[in-house]
Amino acid sequence: PSDITLSLAKGARMAGALIYEDTKVTGIEVDKGVIKGIETSQGYISCGVVIACCGQWTRDFARCVGVNVPLVSVEHQYMVTEPIAGVSPDMPTLRDPDRLTYYNEEVGGLVMGGYEPNPIMWAKNGIPKGFHYQLLESNFDHFEPIMEQALGRVPALQTAGVKMLTNGPESFTPDGNFILGEAPELKNFMSAPALTPME
């Protein structure tokens, strides 16, 4: 994901975009339904379009201008295994939509995760102030059904050592589809917050 992000940023800069990192947007100036600019921790920036692509923070951010972005943060877990014979760095990512699982190579082992049919909601009243990509406590009981599905696809997981089980919040839409485009409530307010693949 970081390589994709850096590539998109490079392309945006080549097209004239300015990217401000570590800069908090504190407000959006709207005059008669037209976006005029944004207030930031670094000062005012004049603009006619706002693109809200801030993941699980998008819902709260959009509310400041009356835009509803239907997102929910849920706990998302994946495990990382010890090296497995036959797994190589050029192994393609494997997704099994029937089992709702995914697999990709990680230092000779596998990252394996899945999308639970009964996810655990997190921060339903808003992301806690000061939360910045921290991890949540692992929940082995909740991960067990995903593991059972994975064993049916990748039997080598039965004997693979597990380095870690990681749990972190991710944002999803109620129907699992993407939200991408202009908000109906405000012209030129675009959103692209939940692009997590579930299918």
What is each model feature region?
Residues S7, D98, E137-E199:
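C-terminal catalytic lobe of FAD-dependent flavoproteins
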Residues V34-I38, P89-P92, N188:
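Short, hydrophobic/aromatic-rich segments at coil-to-beta transitions
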Residues Y44-D90:
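Central helical "cap/lid" subdomain
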Residues V25-I28, L94, Y102-Y103, L180:
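A structural signal for short hydrophobic beta-strand segments in well-ordered beta-sheet cores
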Residues V69-S73, M91-R95, T101, G161, ...:
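Short Gly/Pro-enriched turn/cap motifs at secondary-structure boundaries
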Residues I84-Y115:
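Conserved FAD-binding catalytic core of PHBH/FMO-like flavoproteins
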Residues E105-G152:
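Conserved FAD/dinucleotide-binding core of flavoprotein oxidoreductases
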Residues P1-V49, W57:
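Helical element adjacent to the flavin cofactor pocket in flavoenzyme catalytic cores
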